[in-house]
Amino acid sequence: MRRGGPSVLGIVLAGGEGKRLMPLTADRAKPAVTFGGTYRLVDFVLSNLVNADILRICVLTQYKSHSLDRHITTTWRMSSLLGNYITPVPAQQRLGPRWYLGSADAILQSLNLVYDERPEYIAVFGADHVYRMDPRQMLGEHIESGAGVTVAGIRVPRAESSSFGVIAPGSDGQTVENFLEKPADPPGLPGDPECVFASMGNYVFTTKVLIEALQRDAEDGDSVHDMGGSILPALTDRGEARLYDFSANHVPGETTRDQGYWRDVGTLDAYYDAHMDLIAERPAFNLFNRSWPIYTHSGQLSPARFNAGGIASESIISAGCLIRGQVTRSVLSPGVVVDPGAVVQGSVLHDNVHVGRGAVVRGAVLDKNVEVPPGATIGVNPGRDADLYTVSKGGVIGLGKGQRVS
């Protein structure tokens, strides 16, 4: 941070494979997946850090990282005159000829970055969630408490706990009494037994505490070398962990509807549902907040165009789109073409998708460059769709990059 504040290094964990989000992650890392028409998932965490004046950030990458590396280097160019940077850091095998064994091992292998910067605190954040947050408020509570690590938590239904790391707070509601990685049946919260605190994957560490924890973990032959599965439980056992309640975080320009909004979009269903949150008249998450913007590279495209017969309602239509058919409750990325007589309903279309004359697309997520030929249908015949495409548990149809519809 600048302007006389504490020195903070941002580390963004962006090395996961994202298998649950197939087919969108077949050719790219999950943080590089398009979201909301023009953004990449990584843009949300980077925007939150930059808006909070955390301007020295390392993004640790590993699997299928070319698209992510290119996006970061071409979009997130900070002023080097002021010593600021956002840089992708691929696995460098500094500790031997091996890839990262887990998120904790990724940071361990990148400690040279910490030694170079010598920050007082380190903000370790995930790269693939949709939300707005002011990390300065979490940092302030961390410094005031004197804890070794502060973990951001959000209330979720207890029935969903198996998808998250779960934080069990102590009697004071602030110290962390237990940290459970994806438990099947954890106890509920006092006074709210049907909810638990899920870890958001965002942590603030006192630098010395993190380094020592990573070194101890590296010597543990039984460890999985993961932040949630290893480091957090170990620091909890040592009494050094504190909970930060995300509901207390406020950003400028937020509405009562999107305050506290956070989504893990790690599955096709969750990804689709988060897009549907964007398009209501009163959206659950409002992309149009100029007081706390989400930044990205907008490209050099002409404005969207609607020809005679082209209609769109309750939708996000990006630059470069040509709409000659009907689009409802959908999100279209740049360069999408919808031909006359075509119908797109409740769908997410990535860059340069072409929906041919008279075609129908319903309840689908189409990756970039997908071709839907004239008269073809997606989301009309469930049996046929299941034979040809990826279909999620919730019935969302997914087509991979460049796939042509039969």
Swiss-Prot record:
It comes from the Bacteria. Its EC number is 2.7.7.27. The lineage of its organism: Bacteria, Bacillati, Actinomycetota, Actinomycetes, Kitasatosporales. It catalyses: alpha-D-glucose 1-phosphate + ATP + H(+) = ADP-alpha-D-glucose + diphosphate. Alpha-D-glucose 1-phosphate binds at Y100, G165, E181, K182, S199. Keywords: ATP-binding, Carbohydrate metabolism, Glycogen biosynthesis, Glycogen metabolism, Nucleotide-binding, Nucleotidyltransferase, Transferase. The gene is glgC. The keyword Methyltransferase does not apply. Disulfide bonds: none annotated. Signal peptide: none annotated. CDD domains: ADP_Glucose_PP, LbH_G1P_AT_C. Gene3D superfamilies: Hexapeptide repeat proteins, Spore Coat Polysaccharide Biosynthesis Protein SpsA, Chain A. It is an enzyme of class 2 (transferase). GO terms for biological process: glycogen biosynthetic process. HAMAP family: GlgC. Homotetramer. GO terms for molecular function: ATP binding; glucose-1-phosphate adenylyltransferase activity. Pfam families: Hexapep_GlmU, NTP_transferase. Involved in the biosynthesis of ADP-glucose, a building block required for the elongation reactions to produce glycogen. Catalyzes the reaction between ATP and alpha-D-glucose 1-phosphate (G1P) to produce pyrophosphate and ADP-Glc. This is Glucose-1-phosphate adenylyltransferase. Belongs to the bacterial/plant glucose-1-phosphate adenylyltransferase family.
